[in-house]
Design a protein with these regions (language model features):
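Conserved core of the PLP fold type I
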Residues: 57, 62-198, 208-223, 297, ...
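Conserved PLP-binding catalytic core of the aspartate aminotransferase-like
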Residues: 315-348
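Hydrophobic residues in well-ordered beta-strands that form the structural core
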Residues: 122, 143, 201-203, 277, ...
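N-terminal small-domain helix-loop-helix segment of the aminotransferase-like
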Residues: 10-101, 282-283, 350, 393-397
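Conserved glycine-rich beta-strand-loop-beta hairpin in the small C-terminal domain of fold type I
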Residues: 278, 295-305, 317-330
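PLP-dependent enzyme catalytic core of the Aspartate aminotransferase-like
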Residues: 346-347, 361-397
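Conserved core segment of the aminotransferase class I/II
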Residues: 222-295
Length: 397
């Protein structure tokens, strides 16, 4: 029997991230700036090992039976407490879902709210899964032009005038793939447009706790006076990606609808990982742990920026992240980026082409994402020396 799949579930465009991973596997000396994994040395391995031991041996039967669909109660309590106390979010009329990482939410939100033909507004280059999850529901993942401060409000308003918009998807802190952080004034402009056109905002903030420079900027959710923001967070980037624990906080009515769909499609997520995260949060000074994570990431980011400034062509630009995991390298428009990519790969340096992150309507782009979290400082310096020399070869001094 042959199966005919609808176009909406077919991924569009090449998977450049997978290509870099597969071509680099087993290659001696390959330095990858392509894979967006957390830094291994930032994961509190011994603390997590101890938490697993305590959770499994304290009450094993509680892990071996069905549990609450909405998630572990203690983890939800600790998460909500941090959202309210640290991030100044108002819990009145709100609900919380514990999810299988923040990634699961990228699928659940469109399934819950989109009709075929609805438009979702997002940065022209943004997280690949956010783009495809909208497309998979028959929606249009419409890319909005950006500048050094993120999404341009006037461009967003032009798109919103179609009347087909449902929500705005944003990673306002240390955006993936660009590393850009949206200033407070810009956030308020975006919020005003959402209010004017009755759009809700999906604020995806998996990197928000990893600020290693500059001042804290309030979340959209913290000034959400009209109850139109869904705030997604994750413990993947701060504790462990493999535990797959995230959360969504927002208007109770919407949260209840998303929870119902989650129950029917994914059921209960594993209790053991939730209880391990709750145990870790109860047993350590989480803020002190975050300071260590930030220190690790700052050291690596500084190594990347310093090596770029030392070795790269003056005609190539690199964003200056103040947190998170990524930087965005933009080439002159006359450079053949496909040839540049292949040359980098042949020199054992992996980078990701901007096409991997292109939303609907995005320009061709002449940029690459660089992730600085996995390589060592020595590997970063060596890789950027190679990359920098190639930028001069392709672009001139």
């Amino acid at each position: 029997m042959s199966f005919s799949l609808p176009e909406r579930v077919t991924l569009k465009g090449p998977n450049f991230i997978r290509e870099v991973f597969e071509r680099g596997v087993g290659v001696e000396g390959f330095i990858s700036f392509g894979i967006g994994n957390p830094a291994p040395e930032a994961i509190p391995v011994e603390v997590i090992e101890k938490a697993f031991d305590e959770v499994v041996h304290s009450n094993p039967m509680s892990l071996l039976q069905y549990g609450p669909m909405q998630g572990d109660a203690r983890l939800a309590e600790l998460t909500l407490e941090r959202l309210v106390k640290t991030h100044k979010m108002n819990p009145e009329g709100q609900g919380l879902i514990i999810s299988n990482g923040a990634g699961q939410l990228l699928g659940l939100v469109p399934i819950t709210v989109l009709e075929p033909g609805d438009e979702v507004y997002m940065d022209e280059f943004t997280f690949t899964s956010a783009i495809n999850s909208v497309r998979n529901m028959g929606g249009k993942a419409l890319g909005i032009k950006t500048d050094e401060y993120g999404m341009i409000p006037s461009e967003l308003e032009k798109a919103a005038q179609s009347g087909k918009g449902k929500y705005i998807y944003l990673i306002p802190n240390f955006q993936n793939p660009t590393g850009i952080t949206m200033p407070l004034e810009r956030r308020k402009e975006i919020y005003a447009i959402a209010s004017k056109y009755d759009l809700f905002i999906y604020e995806d903030d998996p990197y928000g706790e990893i600020r290693f420079a500059g001042e804290y900027i309030p979340t959209f959710k913290s000034f959400d006076t009209e109850n139109r923001v869904l705030y997604a967070g994750s413990y993947s980037k701060t504790l462990s990606a493999g535990l797959r624990v995230g959360f969504l906080f927002g208007p109770a009515k919407v949260i209840e609808a998303i929870q119902a769909l989650k129950n029917n499609t994914a059921g209960q997520m594993p209790l053991v990982t939730q209880k391990v995260v709750a145990n870790v949060l109860d047993s350590i000074d989480y803020d002190a742990h975050l300071e260590n994570v930030r220190k690790v990431y700052k050291t690596k980011c500084d190594a990347l920026l310093n090596a770029f400034n030392k070795y790269a062509s003056s005609k190539v630009k690199l964003t200056q992240p103040t947190g998170g995991m990524f930087a965005w390298m933009t080439m002159p428009e006359d450079v053949d980026c496909d040839e540049f990519f292949e040359t980098c790969m042949n020199r054992n340096v992996g980078i990701i082409k901007c096409g991997a992150f292109a939303a609907d309507g995005a320009g061709e782009g002449h940029a690459f994402r660089l992730s600085y979290t996995v390589p060592t400082v020595e590997e970063i310096t060596k890789g950027m020396e190679i990359l920098g020399a190639l930028t001069k070869e392709f672009c001139g001094e």
